[in-house]
Amino acid sequence: MKLSDFDFDLPSELIAQYPSSKRDHSDLLIAATPPIKTKFYNIIDYLKEGDLLVFNNSKVIKAKLNLEKNRPLSKLAYRDKFEGDMECRTAVYTNVREDSSTGSTYKLPLEVELEKRSNITINLNQRLSNNCWSAFAKPARRLNIGDEFHFDNHKVIIVEKLAIGEIKVKFELDDISVFEFLDKYGEMPLPLYIRHHEAQKSNNERYQNIYSSIEGSVAAPTAGLHFTNDILNKLKAKNIQTTFLTLHVGAGTFLPVKTENIHEHKMHTEYCSITPDTARLINKAKQEKQRIIAVGTTTLRTLESSCNNGTVKACDFETDIFITPGFKFQTADILLTNFHFPKSTLFMLICAFAGFKEMHKLYKYAIKEKMRFFSYGDATLLYRKI
């Protein structure tokens, strides 16, 4: 299939810039015939006793760091004043002139070396070791191997330049962990399409799932943002089971597909973990023909990556699974997810799960109903097409 097969027109005003007033007050679209539009707090009505909901418990870290670097410019002939935020570092005064009207002399700088301050943003991507991470830098061309950036008694060092825009950084910290450092100096890494950043404290809360517990994601597993403690209690009261796995979402989740032949696209790798207890619950539900509901595409990708001949394995691993139409699913019966970008790997995934034509039709309905898209947007409950 071609990349253009997964395109659709999305009005920009439907891209959610803010979360709903309350987590569970977002809209929920049930992929029934015809579609049912309701509120998320009614999701309990579409689940039944014995269902098993599988959540991703990864916690978003403050993975965005703002750096400042003084960038030297070439030596220039410069006769008048210095402009902007440039600072004169050195000046060679080789010509002394006399003011004929006053008789006084003055020095004319013929050659100066200038410096300009550059603002650089890095977004951590994946943990490579205790103190080393891969990251995406913008603009990466302003960074050099060996550059050091100081945060009080701590240092961030550029140790390698990888693919275009990607770097490797090392943290040299004074008696704190990388996560503690990021919590103090970093910012929540909101997607670029969310243009407001003024309410950082609010984003720290709302761009995090209430059940998140294991630090490591640089973007939220957004399907879970709608859940509240009240909904979790109602699930328990209805004898609906819940369990957790981990996939640390990397910054590569926002990278676009650039090849028209979708099978030429290379997925980023992400760390996953499934505990023995979680694997046992999932396999038991499958054996007893109970429905398995994957909360989010990250959960579904982890389940399918770990499944061998219909059995989910307990393991720690990395996955770069790329799910497109034609994929044979072995785990989830239902997928809860937000609305995704045109031509994205996630839209391809839901087309594989619930049907290519069906998803184009459902998204057309959602757009007509002015439902809200992407991270802070509304949710949809999709049923696997057999």
Curated annotation (Swiss-Prot):
Location in or out of the cell: Cytoplasm
This protein's gene is called queA
Entry keyword set: Cytoplasm, Queuosine biosynthesis, S-adenosyl-L-methionine, Transferase
> Can you name this protein?
S-adenosylmethionine:tRNA ribosyltransferase-isomerase
Q: Does the keyword Cell cycle apply?
A: no
Q: Which reaction does it catalyse?
A: 7-aminomethyl-7-carbaguanosine(34) in tRNA + S-adenosyl-L-methionine = epoxyqueuosine(34) in tRNA + adenine + L-methionine + 2 H(+)
Catalytic activity, EC: 2.4.99.17
Example GO molecular function: S-adenosylmethionine:tRNA ribosyltransferase-isomerase activity
Instruction: Read off the InterPro entries from this record.
Output: QueA, QueA_dom1, QueA_dom2, QueA_sf, RPE1
Gene Ontology cellular component annotations, sorted alphabetically? cytoplasm
- Determine if Transferase is one of this entry's keywords: yes
Would you identify the family this protein belongs to, as annotated?
Answer: Belongs to the QueA family.
Q: What does this protein do?
A: Transfers and isomerizes the ribose moiety from AdoMet to the 7-aminomethyl group of 7-deazaguanine (preQ1-tRNA) to give epoxyqueuosine (oQ-tRNA).
Outline the subunit composition. Monomer.
Entries under Pfam families matching the protein: Queuosine_synth
Q: In which pathway does it act?
A: tRNA modification; tRNA-queuosine biosynthesis
Q: Which GO terms describe its biological process?
A: queuosine biosynthetic process; tRNA wobble guanine modification
Q: Give the primary localization class.
A: cytoplasm
